C-alpha cells in the first residue's frame, strides 16, 4: 500500500491504522508540511515529490503496490485564495504526474482525500453527495478538479477510485505519539488548546449572530482515527472489485464554536477566555455532512464521535507536544 502524504496529519494516522491491521505500508512525502517524526517506524519511507515522475516510477517498479491512498495536497483555504497558482501546481499538476505513473505501471486503485469544500455554500443540511458542487475558493476548486481527473482517467484507462469528502478532521491517536501539528495552525480545536498550553491568551470567536441556536458557526467534527478507518474501508471496497464512488464522511452532528470551547474548558480545566469578533467573509452558518452512504456501502461506523473524546485525545497530544513534533 502506498500512502502519499503519509507524514502529514491524516496520512500518518491512516498509515498507523494500516500497519495495525498487518498491512505493508510504503510512505512517500516531500515533508513540505509533513513531519518525519510522524512516519510510523514500521513503514518504509521514500522522501520525494509528486512532481518527480522518476521518483514515482521507482517506487512502482521496486515495490509491490496494489493500491494508492492520496493525501499529498496543500489544504489551507486562505492561502489558496492569496496564492492560487501554488495550489493548482501542487494539487493538480502533481496529481496528473501521479496518474501518468499509475497508468504506466498498471496501478488501478486509488483512494483520494477530498474535501467537503467541493460543495461551497451548501444548498441543504446535511449535505449529500448528489448536492451541487460549487467551490468558493481555489483549494476546493483543485480538489473538485482532482476528482474529475480521476473520473476521466477511469473512463480512459480503467482506474477505479474512491473520493472521500470530509470537513473538520480533529483529535489524535490514542497513543498520544502522533497528532496535529500545523504551522501556522488554522484549525479550531488546536487553536483553542493553545490557550491552556500558554501559547495564546484567548481564542477568537468570529461572529455571534449567525442563525444558529447560540449564534456561532456550526461545524461537523470527525476524529482522525475514524477518518483513517474510512480510508482503509475504501481500499477494501476497491479490492473487492466495486466501482468508483464518492462518499461524504462526517458524524452528521454539528457543534457550534461555543460548544467546542465549553467542552475544551471541561476537558482541560482551564477557563480559556474567548473574545467575540466580527464575522469572517464567506463563513457559512452551518456545515454538516450526511455520511449515510458511507455507512451503508462501506460499512463505516465512526466510534470516536463524542466531542469530549475528540478534544480529550487532542489535548493528550498537545499538552505533551506543545510545539508539535
Predicted features, each with a name:
Residues 191-325:
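C-terminal substrate-binding subdomain of Rossmann-fold SDR/epimerase-dehydratase oxidoreductases
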Residues 82-87, 178-182, 221:
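Short glycine-enriched, charge-decorated loop/helix-capping segments at active-site entrances
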Residues 124, 135-142, 181-188, 220-224:
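The catalytic Tyr-centered alpha-helix of NAD(P)H-dependent dehydrogenases
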Amino acid at each position: 500500500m502506498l500512502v502519499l502524504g503519509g507524514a502529514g496529519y491524516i496520512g500518518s494516522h491512516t498509515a498507523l491504522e494500516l500497519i495495525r491491521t498487518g498491512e505493508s505500508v510504503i510512505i512517500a512525502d516531500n515533508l513540505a508540511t509533513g513531519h518525519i517524526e510522524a512516519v510510523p517506524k514500521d513503514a518504509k519511507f521514500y522522501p520525494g515529490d509528486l512532481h518527480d515522475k522518476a521518483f514515482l516510477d521507482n517506487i512502482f517498479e521496486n515495490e509491490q503496490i496494489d493500491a494508492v491512498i492520496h493525501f499529498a495536497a496543500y489544504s489551507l483555504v486562505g492561502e489558496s485564495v492569496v496564492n492560487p497558482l501554488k495550489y493548482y501546481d501542487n494539487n493538480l499538476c502533481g496529481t496528473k504526474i501521479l496518474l501518468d505513473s499509475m497508468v504506466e505501471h498498471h496501478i488501478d486503485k486509488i483512494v483520494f482525500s477530498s474535501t467537503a469544500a467541493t460543495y461551497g455554500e451548501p444548498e441543504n443540511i446535511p449535505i449529500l453527495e448528489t448536492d451541487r458542487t460549487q467551490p468558493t475558493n481555489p483549494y476546493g476548486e483543485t480538489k473538485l478538479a482532482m476528482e474529475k481527473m480521476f473520473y476521466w482517467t477511469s473512463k480512459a484507462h480503467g482506474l477505479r477510485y474512491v473520493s472521500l469528502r470530509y470537513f473538520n478532521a480533529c483529535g489524535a491517536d490514542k497513543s498520544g505519539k502522533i497528532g496535529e501539528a500545523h504551522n501556522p495552525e488554522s484549525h479550531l480545536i488546536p487553536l483553542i488548546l493553545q490557550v491552556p498550553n500558554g501559547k495564546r491568551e484567548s481564542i477568537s470567536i468570529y461572529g455571534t449572530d449567525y442563525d444558529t441556536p447560540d449564534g456561532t458557526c456550526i461545524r461537523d467534527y470527525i476524529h482522525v482515527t475514524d477518518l483513517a478507518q474510512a480510508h482503509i474501508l475504501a481500499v477494501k471496497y476497491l479490492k473487492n472489485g466495486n466501482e468508483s464512488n464518492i462518499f461524504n464522511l462526517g458524524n452528521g452532528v454539528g457543534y457550534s464554536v461555543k460548544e467546542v470551547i465549553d467542552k475544551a474548558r471541561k476537558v482541560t480545566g482551564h477557563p480559556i477566555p474567548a473574545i467575540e469578533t466580527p464575522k469572517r467573509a464567506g463563513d457559512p452558518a452551518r456545515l454538516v455532512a450526511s455520511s449515510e452512504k458511507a455507512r451503508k456501502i462501506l460499512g463505516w461506523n465512526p466510534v470516536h464521535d463524542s466531542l469530549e473524546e475528540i478534544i480529550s485525545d487532542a489535548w493528550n497530544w498537545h499538552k505533551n507536544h506543545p510545539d508539535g513534533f
